[in-house]
């Protein structure tokens, strides 16, 4: 069980993400992380092992990370030990796709083996990194939109999950998908 939060708007995203994660901390306290797109369109990722307090300290309560679009995650480890490396968000090899995930990807080992054969490297022992790189694979292979790439990946992923992703080439957008797992989206 994990907690996912996202924000797109006019305010600085990091403090809002951290506030949202604090409300979801009961869903996971092994590690936490955020990804925020800065004004130069680069996506900055900050992660911390342990409770959310560590991430809050690392980001100066969000005031050291600038941008108005981001995703955050608080983790309860299912695949891979609690560590900063296994903390979400995870990225594609080139950093174009960034994602967080809640749930279980049952066939992640099989998908990972196929991605390794296609030149992908893995740094964590999580199923989430596999999902992010699978989406990246379809995004690059077929030159589809993020929605098409996510749809191609979802057809191949077995399990119950919810995903939130950002693409460096699509600023101020967050893409979400779910299968048999809850996802609530609010608009204010």
Which ranges hold each PLM region?
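Conserved short alpha-helical segments that host acidic/polar catalytic motifs at enzyme active sites
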Residues: 1-188
